[in-house]
From Swiss-Prot:
The gene is tuf. GTP binds at residues 19-26, 81-85, 136-139. Belongs to the TRAFAC class translation factor GTPase superfamily. Classic translation factor GTPase family. EF-Tu/EF-1A subfamily. This is Elongation factor Tu. It is an enzyme of class 3 (hydrolase). The lineage of its organism: Bacteria, Pseudomonadati, Pseudomonadota, Alphaproteobacteria, Rickettsiales. It comes from Rickettsia helvetica. Pfam families: GTP_EFTU (PF00009), GTP_EFTU_D2 (PF03144), GTP_EFTU_D3 (PF03143). GO terms for molecular function: GTP binding; GTPase activity; guanosine tetraphosphate binding; translation elongation factor activity. Mg(2+) binds at T26.
């Protein structure tokens, strides 16, 4: 059987459902596929198919995630749903499932709960750009004043964590009614998808971002100069363009005099390509793995930052004991490890395996970084944590 070719006729967006346990995230995910299947925009996927999410490994961490895909009139969506709260924390911090936007599911019968707060905070920390709210289980609430109160609470909570709480669309409905095929249930799902279509912005494609390539290897080719290899993370590099070598040492300027892929010479390399880049006048010993090639001025090296981190549990192969202030592990950014010291907030004595925490890191050498950059924490060659840079401290 030939594999169906993925037709990319519509713009693609990655989204996910977030919210408190039992507020109906998985029911909503199933309802979206079932309602959109009626117009041919999805394959109807039952609740139990989504709930039995397969385990995946991302940077040594096991995460259960269900993926469904569907399309509206305007877009193609890849949608992630996680069965457990811990899976969300890991997913958002590792970026295993990149989210361009989220659907926050809140039960109208219960209102915002602790994980509602935690997911909103995490979404802000890891840079989820926008979200839409689905107030679920409205069929269980008879009092319209109560619905209004819950909506106000959710909007206040979103504003508190830096989202535009007053303007975020809030759709009221019942995923269960939609699953049962009731017209009011389906109407709410269609309203929700219209809101997602119009309110969640189209992500900037990787090729439209400034050029950046983490250096994996460096070679010296006699008579031609120094070649660095790696996978282009974003943007496009053209032969003849000026670039900077950033991280670990002082930033150096150089020029790309050749781009090679699979032993063929190209005019340009673009995001996703594994390329060799020839650098004019750069000596082999001036460049090393762990640095990046970048568009001049687009990224700076830093050695102090704040991070949101998930610490692996003992069962996941992490530490067996908590760590305290001044813990000095290795931080693995893109292609290299750099030693750093962890500074915990004043009110935190220690971080337990299986927890997520916010703290400051001071590296012994600067790394090219921007907010949103992912990293692993390693100790003796094994991964003990995963994190994301939330703020750079100069």
């Amino acid at each position: 059987m030939a594999k169906a070719k993925f037709e990319r006729t519509k713009p693609h967006v990655n989204i996910g459902t977030i919210g408190h346990v039992d507020h109906g995230k998985t029911s909503l995910t199933a309802a979206i596929t079932i309602v959109l299947a009626k117009t041919g925009g999805a394959k109807a996927t039952a609740y139990d198919q989504i709930d039995a999410a397969p385990e995946e490994k991302e940077r040594g961490i096991t995460i259960s995630t269900a993926h469904v895909e569907y399309e509206t009139k305007n877009r193609h969506y890849a949608h992630v749903d996680c069965p457990g709260h811990a899976d969300y924390v890991k997913n958002m911090i590792t970026g295993a499932a990149q989210m361009d936007g989220a659907i926050l599911v809140v039960s109208a019968a219960d209102g915002p709960m602790p994980q509602t707060r935690e997911h909103i905070l995490l979404a802000k920390q890891v840079g989820v750009p926008a979200m839409v709210v689905f107030l679920n289980k409205v069929d269980m609430v008879d009092d319209p004043d109560l619905l209004e109160l819950v909506e106000m609470e959710v909007r206040e909570l979103l504003s508190k964590y830096g989202f535009p709480g007053d303007e975020i669309p809030v759709i009221k409905g019942s995923a269960l009614q939609a699953l049962e095929g009731k017209p009011e249930g389906e109407k709410a799902i269609n309203e929700l998808m219209d809101a997602v279509d119009s309110y969640i912005p189209q992500p900037v494609r990787a090729t439209d971002k400034p050029f950046l390539m983490p250096i994996e290897d460096v070679f010296s080719i006699s008579g031609r100069g120094t070649v660095v290899t790696g996978r282009v993370e974003s943007g496009i590099i053209k032969v003849g363009e000026e670039i900077e070598i950033v991280g670990l040492k002082d930033t150096q300027k150089t020029t790309c005099t050749g781009v090679e892929m699979f032993r063929k010479l190209l005019d340009e390399g673009q995001s996703g390509d594994n390329v060799g880049i020839l650098l004019r006048g750069t000596k082999r010993e001036e460049v090393e793995r762990g640095q990046v090639l970048a568009k001049p001025g687009s990224i700076k090296p830093h050695d102090k930052f704040e991070a949101e981190v998930y610490v692996l549990s003992k069962e996941e192969g992490g530490r067996h004991t908590p760590f305290t202030n001044d813990y000095r592990p290795q931080f693995y950014f893109r292609t290299t490890d750099v030693t750093g010291t962890i500074k915990l907030p004043f009110d935190k004595q220690m971080v337990m395996p299986g927890d997520n925490a916010t703290f400051t890191v001071e590296l012994i050498k600067p790394i090219a970084m921007q907010e949103g950059l992912k990293f692993s924490i390693r100790e003796g060659g094994r991964t003990v944590g995963a994190g994301v840079v939330t703020k750079i401290n100069n």
